[in-house]
């Protein structure tokens, strides 16, 4: 109702729910622990601490239906990026952010997709990963 994000349902060819994801814009303040290279990737400037970034949140597959287990996480990311590219063509933007819990299966997945960890966080915080939109397509 507040229009901060949009959630998309991904339906397969048999009209089964295959997965879902949420897209939003997020204001980021990049602290001093973030390398200049990653700061430049996000904001375009190595000395600019504030930036807006696209956020892919709540990325998930439907494991409840055995008929859609073939649907990959890579496919969900690609569909989300297609929507982000449409927004980028209209309003601009440089990078995409994902946040995840510190579980190896999640961190390995995002690193496999080309995301880089933005900064090390405490063990109870979400990990933050970014990727340049140029690297996604």
Task: Locate predicted features.
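Non-catalytic substrate-recognition and accessory regions of acyl/acetyltransferase enzymes
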Residues: 1-68, 75-97, 101-137
């Amino acid at each position: 109702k507040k229009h901060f994000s949009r959630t998309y349902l991904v339906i397969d060819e048999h009209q089964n729910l295959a997965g879902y994801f949420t897209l939003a814009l997020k204001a980021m303040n990049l602290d001093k622990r973030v390398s200049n290279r990653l700061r430049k990737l996000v904001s375009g400037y190595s000395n600019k601490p504030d930036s807006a970034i696209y956020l892919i949140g709540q990325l998930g597959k439907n494991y409840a239906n055995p008929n859609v287990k073939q649907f990959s996480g890579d496919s969900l990311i690609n569909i989300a990026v297609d929507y982000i590219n449409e927004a980028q063509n209209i309003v601009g933007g440089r990078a995409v952010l994902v946040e995840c819990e510190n579980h190896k299966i999640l961190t390995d997945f995002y690193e496999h997709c080309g995301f880089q960890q933005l900064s090390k966080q405490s063990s109870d915080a979400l990990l933050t990963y970014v990727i340049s939109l140029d690297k996604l397509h």
